Amino acid sequence: MNFCSKNAQMYYIPVGLTSLQKDLIEILLCMHAESFLEEFGPSEAVMQSAAQIKTEKEPEAVEGLGLGPLTPTQMNTMLLRHLRAVANHPCLLVDHYMPRKFLLMEPGEELIAMSEKFRVLNQMMEAILSRRRRQRPLQLVLVSHSVKELDLIEGFMLGKMVKIKRLSGTSLFDEKHQYTERGTAAAESNSTLTSGSTLKDTSPGSVEGKLSSGEAGAGYTTGGIKDDYDYQNSRRHMRAADDGAERQCDHEDWLFLATTTHLTHCTDLFDQYDVDVVLSLDPLLDVSLPALRSVRKQSKSVPLVKLFVQDSAEHFMLTRGISAEHEEDHIYDAVGHFIKNRGVHRQRLGMSAAALAEVVTALLENCEAATDLKSTKPTDTPSELSIVDALSERIMLLKLNHTPYELPLQRGPFSMKSYQLQLKQLIYARLEACQREQECKCAYILDRRMQETANLNRLDEVNAEAGRLFQSLKDEEKLVVDSERRLERTRDEHDRLREKSAHLRRRKAELEELLASSDLDSRVSSKRARLAELRQQLMPLEQQNTAMADSNEELRTRYQTRSSHAATLSSALASLRERKAALTKESTGPATCWMAASATEEHDRLQTELNDLVQQRHFLQKYIDTMKSQYAITNLDELNRTQHNKSGAATSRVRTTRATSPTYI
């Protein structure tokens, strides 16, 4: 597999770091800062950083462990190895192997959540495995740094729709998968379909069983088959054979797990496998290894996907073309680049989901490579930033808001045991600080929840009180409205009584005036005369009013009669309109149209037939006239009658005996 050729495909996927990985990296840097500056930095830099180093134990305690101190070169080599392990997965920082039961019982989501590289790998595997299953199954190779990393990968890959085969190390759980080559599997499937022995139903009640036992033949048999048709070639039988072959076909993908060391020492590792895609968690994987070149014989191009942490030491060496064999010669530049640029991981989220989906699509469709090293180049380091300042600051350390925590630079020298002990203590202290921070945040959240609950309770009380006040206000408004209505009625009654009182006062004044006057009789007489005059004027008015009342009654009666007649006509008109609408709908409906079309066609047919009969009559009339003129026929009716009598006499029968059958003469 030549990834440098024209048909080769190289994919470079940068990833970020999780909070746990960033904290562990800061702990490692504070452990190795002194040794890193002691080997690569100037002496004044060491003196400058010595003021910031906190002494936590005496040299006598280190010597009491019984092991010699580690040299700065060994410490820096360990730093590079540990940074690489943490960048892959935090669990790889442990020197011993993970227990098999722990990896089998640990939820895969927790293993994935610890590492950003594992999260991206899981997204890619989910996208690959969730594609259309009708396609050709893929054979994937996953290359890692170590066997421990393969154990973690197998731990969260178990249970997925893929067959896992460990090429390096011991499998956590042997699923007993047997690998067969694609050509061999296809040949076996074809031979199965050709022979048909595995798909035939040879039971005595089946057609195949009767045919095989000789019960079915050309003639009638006991089984009831009367023909010589070969039922093995029926459509139902062939469809059942196709379904059985499809079920026997292997649609599950294969995942082969190997390490870089195994690839280096085993040149024929992939000779018996038809590899489609190579996924490498080791960005420094040498593509010129014989194990990878052995796949070059294939006609197809096998893409290689490399996952690396952005601005890591491996990213630096990858862009500079430094191989894994010469990484110790460039350890200062690589680790120094990561130390100075590790702060950019606070804003970097790695490759977006859309870009990752494009990469997976390109892998499945065998398209051109979408990523290269130019698009994922390392971050430019500021020239004014010194390595001492970069080591002194805890840039990537997650800030704790409620728990005091400091991570000072650690002083050496360290032996192997003291180094592991100190590293474990720092990790444990950080874990305790994070747990206290979590407890403080949980307490803060619970306190806020209690406050919000109290606020909601007070709000409910305020709402209830507002409801009561609103109800009382409505009741008072109702009382006010009733009072206003009673006041209005009282005012109306008061005005009416006041007018009545004023009228009575006027009448009283008039009566008093009449009683006090001296000419009472003359005034009474004048009033009576006026009353008689008014009565005389009232009589014609009453007669006129009576006549108008009679006229109004007559007009009212006439109006009622005409209104009733108009209502009757209106109802009749409405019914006629409904009838018209129904008839219109019926006339324009499909049944009426069809009947009208049929009647029209029948009329046309009858008219054509009538025309034909008229023409035939004219023809016969002309023919008769012609025959009369040719043969001098004068009376056709007499001729017809004579012929009819002759024919009747010829076919008459006479009964001469008592026999039951007549005798014809």
UniProtKB/Swiss-Prot annotation:
InterPro entries: HDA1_su2/3_sf, Hda2/3. It is found in: Nucleus. One of its GO terms (cellular component) is cytosol. Residues 647-665 have a biased composition (Low complexity). Keywords: Chromatin regulator, Coiled coil, Nucleus, Repressor, Transcription, Transcription regulation. It comes from the Eukaryota. Residues 187-205 have a biased composition (Polar residues). It holds the Pfam family HDA2-3. Signal peptide: none annotated. Required for activity of histone deacetylase complexes that are responsible for the deacetylation of lysine residues on the N-terminal part of the core histones (H2A, H2B, H3 and H4). Histone deacetylation gives a tag for epigenetic repression and plays an important role in transcriptional regulation, cell cycle progression and developmental events. This is HDA1 complex subunit 2. The gene is HDA2.
